[in-house]
Amino acid sequence: MPGSSTSSLDRIRSDQLGRLRAGLPAVLRSNRFWRQRLHDVMGWDDFERLPLTTKADLMADQQAHPPFGTNLTHPGDRYVRVHQTSGSSGARPLRWLDDAESWSWWRRVWADHVYRSAEVTPADRVFLAFSFGPFIGFWSAFGGAEELGALAISGGAMTTEQRIRTIAEVGATVLCCTPTYALRMVEVGREIGVDVPGSPLRVAIHAGEPGASIPSTRAAIEAGLGVRCFDHTGMTELGPTGVSCSQRDGVHLIESEFIFEEVDGELIATNLGRWGSPLIRYRTGDRVELRREPCSCGSPFVKVVGGLRGRLDDMFTVRGVNLYPSQVEDIVRRHPEVVEFMIEHRRLRHMDEVTLLVETTDGQSPLERLRSDLRQALGARINCREVPAGTLPRAELKAQRLRRIADQ
């Protein structure tokens, strides 16, 4: 790809506007949800006047018109797949439909952008360490591997030990899972005496959490699995939005398939290949810093500096200092004796109190160093408390690192 330049940006913008204008007529004609909110778009000024859309808007629509809402451009019998959001934020999950064309788009974006950016080829064997539930992320990874021509290997209905042994037995070279689950595989591999770094794995693609863009977490995974990590971003209702490149200093957003904006530090996205249930100017809730500059990987696409480091609703406050779980994780993962952690945030007499709960390896207590490192790096005093092994939850999908406790 050519390097980022004015000419490449002009080309990207022209292609985006062309695809938007090609897709909108059918939406305006038959999609009840968008017909009330949109008008025809002739140029970028028209586009920027369109209203922002929120997840609350989508949830309200599905509650008013169950089970799938009114964001449907085609008759119901045109749709071939249904998935739903993880519901990890505590909210009711969204259900999302795809027609055959939209699902083909998902697979193609994974194959052409996510896998190729992670240097995955048709010769690879891709192991997908997840259960085949309604969450779309790894279904699309499986379909993308097929689209690429790689061997797609399901890790469904397996224990972590079985997955580790299967990876070695079948010669898997690529792993797809959450960052938290990758660290769980490292932990279990050590417990059962398997040399996981000695397996054929060479690449790991992570999604669902910011971990693969957090330097200390990425380093722990790479050392523990013997792989090179790549971060992937996406949303069930939106699509596969980005992937880190060989430089791994951020995530390139896939501008050939989406329109991206940064509004008050939040990522706003419009998909351009999912017209059966499109999203236009959608507030993702992800806090970002976008930067457009030449990248040595050759991508012309805008970069999220440091990756998606957190969601706006994940912010918590310690004595007036605003923090995100990813900032705490970056410090915690520098201490290899910490096996798992959880942040507890509570209000006591109108004051914020934060406690970091940690599980550690036998006989090693890093609490004093942790307290000191957290205070020095974040400018906040955070209580640290060790808990017995096995106390904190292990997650296969998105890990919840922040536990909010009601006012006392």
Short names for language-model regions:
Residues 1-26, 148-408:
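Active-site glycine/GP-rich loop and adjacent strand/helix microenvironment
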Residues 100-116, 125-184:
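AMP-binding/adenylate-forming
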